[in-house]
Amino acid sequence: MAGRGSRLRPHTLTVPKPLIPVAGKPIVHRLVSDIAKVLGEPIEEVAFILGDPAFFGDDVVESLMELADELGAKGSIYRQDKPLGTGHAIMSAKDSLSGPAVIAYADTLIRADFDLDKSADSVIWVKQVERPEAYGVVKLNGNNEIVELVEKPKEFVSDLAVIGIYYFKDVGVLKNQLQHVLDNDITHGGEYQINDGIKRMMQKGMKFVPGKVDEWMDCGNKNVTVETNQRMLSFLEKEGESMIADSVQQENANIVEPCFIGENVVLKNTTVGPFVSVGANTVIENSTIKNSLIQSDSKISNANLDNAMIGNHVVYNGNFETISIGDYSVLE
């Protein structure tokens, strides 16, 4: 979680990307909960690797510790002082690297329903994609085992893209290999990468297999985050999840589902939806809103929004359709 999420600015100027709500729940909260479902067993510890305390401060730590507590797990916080790559980030948490573990990048969302092969030394989670040349992919042998990781292949290797989630039967083995990477200064563009540790494990004959997820959703920028919100709302609706709080106040309002409407939201002379998420305590008046995310404690008036993303504590009175407004902004 140590990155700054620059492609999602202005929203990540005040809130780290993994804590931005999608369909009413922070990205990292959804991710960890969905991983827990696949594991199908109690989680003992959740370790979070954060960057500069000036950006990932006490409020971030509090939210993450609450997430660990919800899972009945111990929460641990580690700091990556410099952005020196995924391998370096993982080794920042080396005190927690023992036994079975999942390592995941915190800014992605999944839907997965597969049986985790815990007999393998590692399971690399993958998604079948249409343009494999744009991703890092896995190469399989005839036994459905991963024998190579290939970054953005120019010639077809496979269409199974690595999504940044890994299960290790004993993550201590990865730790030992990454320690070798750091000790020998094996870098790419000045960064230490998890792939070099994985490749060393493969060279030692360890068994890697793919775990195929059903859906893989990105939150890299505003447009894809809005799209991810749409997809997540659709999934939650199909699963029968209740997404409209009982405390919502409506006056001449219409909600076109699927939508997430948080606690104590006020809707007056307004149509909301489909595919809209509204955070708690937000007031929306005289507006039509679809395909958009609006966070908490904001006031929206006289708006006609489509494909919009509005942060927390925003006052907005206007008619730009596809606007993106960060926290604590006033546009009247």
Residue ranges: model-predicted function:
Residues 47-51, 126, 293, 309:
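Short internal beta-strands
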Residues 7, 13, 20-21, 25-103, ...:
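Conserved N-terminal catalytic core of the sugar/cofactor nucleotidyltransferase
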Residues 106-109:
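The conserved acidic donor/metal-binding loop of glycosyltransferases
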Residues 145-233:
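Catalytic-core segments of class I nucleotidyltransferases/pyrophosphorylases
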